């Protein structure tokens, strides 16, 4: 038991500190108290992420972190930053009196020219570059700095509308790989090409986990510090919607919705109207600075003709030109800057400009947020005016942005709560619960962890065991670390499963069987990089054989591939895929019942004298074609809780009935370590056996208890008459 409890501790996801402690007096005197707190925390962790909103001094914090790492290691630190930010970062270092002799600041594009093993520390400025998890840049960063002892990631928006992107930071900081994080905290929402989202049960635990290796704040108050000097000015979001000329679309009005496919063509069709609106706004404020954000090069060309004094920074410009003009605007060398968000929306400080115009809005919340934050940041003295030029044909773009903003604010709120919990040391790995039991002459059921509860069963007391184990990462039942479904990968699942089946071998009578219901599992391209099947039944077979069971038989249960296709939208089952490239097609995935036997003396054999030849031939078929998938205990949906995800439907009573009939005697004890809503125990009691069942999830346990009371009541009525 001690080994098992130690294993459970390893499932509690925390970040192990690998850094060093430092006193406030040793830090740069220009820092605010909250900044010193963050830098000390990052230095102690060794590998850390700072998700601080714009204007909170990320540049100063990363420079001082780098300075202290240089002193501690007597080595060098590399800061990777967007091109336009490199110059500002160096200027900030000089401004605050930081020794830059061992701190090198270069842009991401120079990564191929860097000898990485010369650095003791690495800083990723605007680390949201990691969001492109399949990109070459991310791959190079992960590989090149894998063995760098000190790492820091800094950005304002780690994941504006997709918390999964936080996993890229986790992987960079050597906390948990992206695939491990997907298995532990995320679920694949139908189909083999669908996206991943946070499991309902995992939301709180995920943000608490992130809070062990990062800090997120939108203001100092989020981590308990005073707001003196950190009050933002008013932000005016001014939407100017243009009604476009009527088009020949066969409808009374123009289409109000666009997609990513026709987005660029729509911009070209509305270019004149939108840019005329831009020019009108700028001419109304002839003495004020403006940033104009565009999407297409043609927009920049036309604006340059309409506004000759403006300076445009394009992607095709030389690095020297970009750097000179982006810094020049910050230094008030000209008053109108035309550029794209992908060029200048990260890292630049444009407090000298309180007017921005989005000449063309797209679906990217992060681009919009980062661009606005160039001007709307702590330290800005004037109210900020953001002009959003939209058209009646692109109404869904603004709706998408609004939705993503809500997601971002939710993430900020959850992260702030988790960080505060972590700061006070009050994070719990699992909800504490008491074991609940219901015991009578027909059944003994308990609510709790089956690995711990099975310790109380007597040696060789079980005549038959029937169960369907948690399918590793496929389904999620609860937020407990004891839940085998909450595993970061299959190795972790099998390690925990092994603790159970060792005990199962002990409690099984000699010569008796364990029946495991399972299936092979689909591999999603979005997670593994390819589409295929995982041999889950093979993993179970290997695990049982390793503890001493004999692999005795396998029953295949037919399932309708049409139903599977409609439910999962699996690429391999789609008819259009057969016509496109049938090498990617596959058959439906059947269920299996794996039969394992404990060898030894057969002092109490199972003699099925009532089993007819016809029925035996039906049971002996290697494929059971006639299992009624609708014949299950009803009401299992009532056992679902608010945050529950997908669940395996209860095991079919037909299957359980045949296994109990074939492999046990009346009066035997039938055991299931994963009781669910009580199907195996229910059928055992109905067939005059005693049932023992364990279930971790309270709502399922309560439903099982009700189901078992009903079958006992039914037996009493049958006996009475």
Predicted regions located by residue number:
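Walker A/P-loop
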Residues: 45-65, 671-683
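A conserved SF2-helicase RecA2
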Residues: 363-432
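Conserved Walker A/P-loop ATP-binding site and its immediately adjacent core
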Residues: 59-64, 74-93, 160-165, 295-297
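Conserved pre-motif I regulatory segment
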Residues: 11-50
